[in-house]
Amino acid sequence: MSLQRAGDGADVQAGADQIGDLFYPLYLRLFDEDGDFVGDVDTKLSEARMADNVEMYISRSLGIGVIAGLLLWLVGLMLGYALFVLVGMNVSVGLPVSPGMADLIETLKIPLLVFVMGLVFGSIGFGIGFGTLIAIPYSRASARGREINMLLSDAVSFMYALSVGGLNQLEILEAMAQADDTYGEVANEFQSIVQETKYFDTDYRTAIRNQAMQTPSDELAQFLTDMLSIINSGGDMTGFLDEKKRKHMRTAKQQQEMTLETLELFGEMYMTLSLFPLLLVIILVIMGIMGNSTDTMLLGTIYGLTPLLGVGFLVMVSTVKQDDPGDGYLNPSDASDRLSQNTDSGLMNLGLVESFTGEYAVFDRVKDREGTHTTLDIMKAPHVFFRDNPTYTLAVTVPVALVILVVAIADGAVPIRWQGLCEAKSALDASTVSCGSDQARVTEEGSKIVVEQGMMHQPVWGTFMYVYMPLYVIVVPLAIFREWNVRSRRRITNNLSENLRKLSSANDTGQTLLDATRTVSDTSSGKIADEFETMYAKVNYGMSLKEALIEFNNKYHIPRLARTVKLISKAQEASSQITDVLSTAAQSSENQDDIERERKSRTMMQVVIIIMTFLTLLAVMAILKTQFLNVMAGLTDQASGGGGGGGGAGGASFNASVNVDRLSLLFFHAVTMQAILSGLIAGYMRSGKLASGLKYVVVLATISLVTWMMVG
């Protein structure tokens, strides 16, 4: 299968190269190879670490743009022909012209309109195709720059720890290049420096200078430039890194402040964006009462515009808000087989025994016994397993939700039609028709004889079974176990800074790092103290301290913890007295605590704004349903029952144009979608993860359900 995938990728790349070769002459005609645009794209390709050369990339972009433009040009021609020829849409400018000129304009009008529509659609297609490909390196370079800026403070602290440990400049660069499991894109930038010196016979000063010009991060470029000055002048590298470490800690706080200010602006924008569909729905309902048919626009607003605005807002927030980079796992290249296997172990991988199966039967039996033991452990404490693996709840809850829904549909307990079935006026063709059909039989009181109820007749129950039941069965367990998982892992980082200070103080008294962990575990309480005690026991039984630290980190796989463990484990390899390194780790952790505390306090207001905006929308929808639609329907029924001419005419007009049950269903669906979107947005703005919004989704959706049970 891997060979097949590789072949498919090669075919795609070959096709892209053919498009680039085909449109290369057009590139030469349109663009100057020494121009600003070509140079800018070349720079972004380098910053994004994309292997394409600028000539072929722009040529390929032109080809994709031309193909997309031709396709949309054909769509525009067909749409124009359908509108102006088949439908006969009349377009008149109203210019005063002579009769002869009017005849000429009338003759050329339709061909010109069709041509112009095709031209407009073709231009849009070319812009989308060409612009999208050109935007890719800009987007990737920007994302890399943001990640580098986020990790630079910790990366400089890591380099400082290496310098304190006695490593020279080249060794620091090489160690930084190998730390890609922790420092991500920052390590990739240093990999470029090391590889240039290793494979291209370039001295490392020139390589640093070149990378300073190619990196997408201005902060890293300035750091490399200043570092080069220290190297050239023979200055104190340790003092330089200590100064830069403090500077970038302050810079990290300033960047967090800018991000929070932008999120506050987005929170204010959300109020306007989310209320726009509500205002449009109100206008469309009023237009419907006045006799104008707006079914398509109403459906498009509720089922199209509302989710589109929510998803668009999420995308907009994602451009400025980024989660802590990395997955939190440490995978050193010199790790033992036991550590590597335990890191990859899980439900489908039993760890070290996997590497011995297949050669000897005894290991196959060990694997079977290990699998049985693991299964029994899960069955004895399934809540612990789901706490550590929240997404595995989907393997249980999704089938349960499907079974409940299928059984309910099979028993006829859930409506399966939108409008239901009613008795037909004439049973020649069929005894029942859709309740929305004109052929449905009407009683003397003006009501239709319903044979099978649809979603409009049971808006709350039908929506509950199709939306809320899966929501509660699937999302509630996932949200509970995920929140439990987050809180259990957070217990490690809550006291991390304090315990690092204790480690530093103990190490300063002359204790080794191992003895310091024992001292801290004896004098502290909480989860991290228990982990220190476990770590001490592992080392006493023969494990190296580095591997014990890595196992401790991989158990919780928190990116922030991974950077701290990487810092300490690398420093303790050089010396057992690492007081300065531990103090640096504690200072970096305290800086992260301050940033996290500020983020929580500032984003809480944005969450409140989002929730209050949703509650306002829900209240307006409920009032519109109870105080307007229900009252109008009641007045219509009274007028019809009284038999008055004017009242009867008004009632017939209202009944013909507005279906109260249908509008109630649409309003309920609108507030339900808004609840789901508002919950996801609130969670994403709060912590940078969509999954953290699940608890808000459940709460807001429940409020919507209870409200509509009372008003619907």
Predicted regions mapped to residue ranges:
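Membrane-interfacial helix-loop-helix connectors in multipass membrane proteins
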Residues: 79-115, 205-215, 286-298, 413-463, ...
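Generic N-terminal leader segments that precede the first folded domain
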Residues: 1-177, 181, 185-188, 638-649, ...
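Membrane-cytosol interface segments
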Residues: 1-52, 92, 303-384, 391, ...
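Juxtamembrane/interface alpha-helical elements of multi-pass membrane proteins
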Residues: 106, 111-211, 222, 330-363, ...
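Hydrophobic alpha-helical transmembrane segments
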Residues: 2-19, 38-49, 206-226, 240-258, ...
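Bilayer-spanning, highly hydrophobic alpha-helical transmembrane segments
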Residues: 58-83, 122-129, 254-316, 402, ...
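Short, Lys/Arg-enriched, Gly/Pro-containing loop segments at transmembrane-helix junctions
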Residues: 144, 322-332, 634-636, 692-694
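Juxtamembrane boundary at the C-terminal end of a transmembrane helix
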Residues: 709-712
